[in-house]
Regions:
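Short beta-strand-to-loop elements that line the ligand-binding cleft
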Residues: 71-78, 97, 213-221, 257-258
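Conserved C-terminal helix/tail region of periplasmic/extracytoplasmic solute-binding proteins
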Residues: 328-350
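A ligand-binding cleft/hinge motif common to bilobed small-molecule-binding domains
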Residues: 102-106, 229-253
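Extracytoplasmic ligand-binding site segments that recognize negatively charged/polar headgroups
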Residues: 46, 50-51, 57, 92, ...
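Periplasmic-binding protein-like
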Residues: 122-127, 139-140, 206-211, 249-274
């Protein structure tokens, strides 16, 4: 005989099931901070970002000095969670900032970003924007970190060929002490690895050598920096130089290396999501990032390098990732699966 339940019990069960499913679907937030308005205003701009509050918080405060009546809710999540929040959950953020250029391009290409045009956006060079939907406000080199203290008299690598040779000839030093992003879990890590694979076949040889050394895998640059500072790591590959520079400026034991065969340069970008409830405020914040006061705060307080074609021309080994739909190639489901299979095989993770 089927058990009977009172209607209120059934209602509560249905509500509980709905809430459980909603919670299961919710994107994972790493940090959220409300910057209250400096003056009475009553409006709030909501920003979703992969950039830590410790980095962009001073830029938010600079924005509020210019716009004291606006409160800012700043939410931090991983690049894949940021993408899911907009693409899958349609969260009503007013501006999305991410270092994962490919995922930002997919949002824009799929019609999930609002067009925004102003005198400030018109001044962005063509290579740092896509249509009227996606704009870069910082360019950042992807670097190698290596412990000078642990390396001792051994030569510091200048190219991937040097690095491969160093790892092969000093396995005892590096075993269990090499770190890099996990491309299966980190959107930025996946972007760096796929772009590496397009630049040179040496990437796969390097991956195989790292795989033989029981490497450690990470989802954030700051975690790798923490571990190289404490000595847990001797080497960290594919680290955001913009994070490493400020944190290691006074640390003589760690070298920040821009490899001379090539060094990837990413563009940190922003979009106004189609789901925004205050796109005017999202556009206002974007214009601030692209204007003189915002640029000064980005450079001087956040420590992020500004968009600068001159820096690229002066250092021919820099390889900027192109902000165009070519970034979407490795987001194809089959290509992603094949790439991660090859990665796992090279790293002996199967």
């Amino acid at each position: 005989m089927r058990a009977a339940f009172p209607a209120p019990v059934l209602t509560l069960a249905i509500v509980a099931l709905f809430l459980w499913r909603a919670a299961a679907a919710a994107f994972e937030v790493e940090e959220e901070r409300l910057f209250p308005a400096l003056d009475r205003g009553g409006r709030e701009v909501s920003i979703l970002s992969t950039t830590d509050t410790s980095v962009l918080g001073p830029v938010v405060e600079a924005y509020q000095r210019r716009h004291p009546g606006i409160a800012v809710r700043y939410t931090v999540a991983s690049s894949q969670e940021v993408f899911a929040a907009i693409a899958d959950e349609e969260r009503p953020f007013d501006l999305v900032i991410s270092s994962a250029m490919d995922l930002q391009m997919k949002l824009a290409n799929d019609g999930l970003a609002r067009a925004h045009r102003s005198a400030r956006t018109d001044a962005v060079p063509p290579w740092a924007r896509w249509q009227d939907n996606l704009y870069a406000f910082a360019q950042e080199n992807v670097v190698l970190l290596i412990s000078r203290k642990a390396l001792g008299p051994l030569p510091q690598p200048q190219t991937r060929r040097d690095l491969i040779e160093l790892l092969r000839e000093n396995t005892a030093l590096f075993r269990g002490r090499v770190g890099t992003y996990d491309p299966a879990l980190s959107g930025a890590g996946y972007l760096f690895a796929t772009q590496d694979s397009r630049q040179s076949d040496s990437f796969w040889r390097l991956a195989e050598v790292m795989g033989s050394l029981a490497p450690r895998f990470y989802t954030a640059t700051n975690e790798m920096i923490d571990d190289i500072k404490t000595g847990k790591l001797v080497l960290a590959y594919n680290v955001l130089g913009s994070y490493a520079g400020p944190r290691l400026a006074d640390d003589p034991d760690v070298a920040i290396v821009e490899l001379q065969d090539y060094t990837l340069t990413l563009l940190r970008t922003a979009i106004i999501p189609a789901t925004s409830k205050a796109p005017d405020l999202g556009g206002e914040f974007l214009d601030f990032l692209l204007g003189p006061e915002g640029k000064a705060a980005i450079r001087d307080e956040a420590g992020l390098p500004l968009i600068d074609a001159g820096a690229l021309a002066a250092h021919p080994y820099l390889r900027p990732m192109r902000l165009d739909p070519g970034l979407l190639v490795f987001l194809d489901r089959l290509k992603r699966r094949d790439f991660l299979d090859e990665w796992n095989s090279a790293l002996m993770r199967n």
